[in-house]
Amino acid sequence: MRNCIESILPGGEEVEIIIVDDGSKKDNTLEIAKEYEEKYPGICKAVHQENGGHGETVNTGLRNASGLYFKVVDSDDWLDSKVLLEVLERIRNLTLSGESIDMLVANFIYDKVGQENKKVMSYANAFPEDKVFGWAEMKNFHLGQYILMHSVIYRTKMLKDCGLQLPKHTFYVDNLFVYEPLPHVKKIYYLNQNLYHYYIGREDQSVNETVMISRLDQQYRVNRLMIECCDVLKVQPKKLRKYMILYLEIITTVSSVLAIKSGTEENLQRKKELWAELREKHFPLWWRMRSGFLGQGVNLPGKIGNKLTILAYKLTQKFYGFN
């Protein structure tokens, strides 16, 4: 956590570091938070909350945020301090010129344990660089390329105005945090530099596949909230609608594959119920997702179909290097 905080401190008084102690673990988070608050008054703010999980931690951070823009940084991760200064300069210049953007996107690095060659998630193929633009100017994303929490900075007021409220005691809310505000984003800025270091590979990490399967109920909870947060088929403009449907397909595919990989009747029933609910409540969306390549791939019949789904998933894992 110290490494995380220290990486943001070079931003000086232009940053507000809200350190939230969730109370979920008996560690020294609050002690460290208060230490930095005393050492850097006006920059660091220590906030304690009763255990509410990751989602409530983000909610608490947003409630306490007074800055123009809001970014979530996990305590295991860190920012490139030089790139942070560049981000602050861009935001400062845009603000002084009267240009208020809703979302700033920067690249992030997958810092995987034991891996020398780090994968960079860049958006140079999809977004124009160093200018304010809208969704109409967005190009197609590559397979495996998405806007994630690690890459996004949102305008604070926009997040509060759109009523973003993440569920308590739930992992995997990062997807909802990024997804739900997208229809409210009108002005975007892309900085083609590697700002965020995403530390992955620990055995106990929430994105570890075994851990995800053990928390599959929470993955499905987030999946449902993403489906219900807006009528995605009515989202404008068309390019944003296309992206949001694709991302929803990806999340639903992950939920489905993990249920299949678990091999338990309980989780296979979860998968069946999710697709049935989607069909009952949002038939046009269900039809679009179910008839697509991914929807067909995770709904192949029988044990042979499940084995083929898992094989395809493993090949995708190997190719893209996730988990």
Question: Each PLM stretch: what is its role?
Answer:
Residues 261-323:
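Membrane-interface aromatic/basic loop that binds lipid-linked glycans or pyrophosphate carriers
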